[in-house]
Amino acid sequence: HLHGDHYLGLPGLISTMQLLGRERELVLYGPKALWDILQLQFNASNTRVSFPFRFVEVDAEKELLDTSNINVSSIKLNHRISCFGFIFKEKPKQRRINGLLVKQLEVPNYFMNNLREGQDYISSSGELYKNEFLTFPPRKSHSYAFCSDNRIKTNFSDKLKGVSILYHESTFLHKELPRARKTFHTTVKEAAELAVEVKPDLLILGHYSARYKELKEL
């Protein structure tokens, strides 16, 4: 979203990428006005970005990226201005081959992908080997939800069910609840209560108010 503490460093970061010789394409996701701001900044400073640069507007909850191994989608947050978070989900992973066994049984190399996909193996002599015998279970796929400035609404946890890592802002201590409500932020206690509902493997807190000089207060 377009509160200054979340984007004002972006023009400098992009300029630094250029100075360091970046060549790969940069894809930026955000509200349309962010693109207008960047164009204004670059035009005012006569900056020409030398690497491929593409902007994708985020204006609703939708899928933003889908590849062979990851899916990224946006989720609407509840803040004073339009604000979105993101959910990153790894795709299910393939089974892992038991290298020692397949070597002993002389399973041909061309069949390895079939094993990874869960197929059983029939040897040249007609003997059936179950996939579970020749492979190990796939490694766990992880997911990460990034929720920046947000005043938690009822049923918001439904959008986050199943994520393994949850980042959620926790600007205030709970004694500042009236302030949190007024500014559309979340308290540490509320973020923790959200995590109890979502049940992630890990909760990460951040976006603390500058009034707190030491994290132990939180």
Identify what each model region corresponds to.
Residues 24-27, 142-144:
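Short active-site oxyanion
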Residues 70-146, 150-159, 165-167:
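Active-site-proximal loop/helix segment associated with metal-binding centers of metalloenzymes
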Residues 25-33, 204-205:
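Short internal beta-strands
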Residues 46-58:
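A glycine-rich helix N-cap at a beta->alpha junction
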Residues 1-19:
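Di-metal (Zn2+ and/or Mg2+/Mn2+) metal-binding site signature of metallo-dependent hydrolases
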Residues 10-13, 38-41, 156:
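Hydrophobic packing residues within well-ordered alpha-helices of enzyme cores
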Residues 2, 32-33, 101-102, 148-150, ...:
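Active-site metal-binding loops of divalent metal-dependent hydrolases
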Residues 60-62, 152-218:
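Binuclear metal-ion centers of metallo-dependent hydrolases, dominated by the metallo-beta-lactamase
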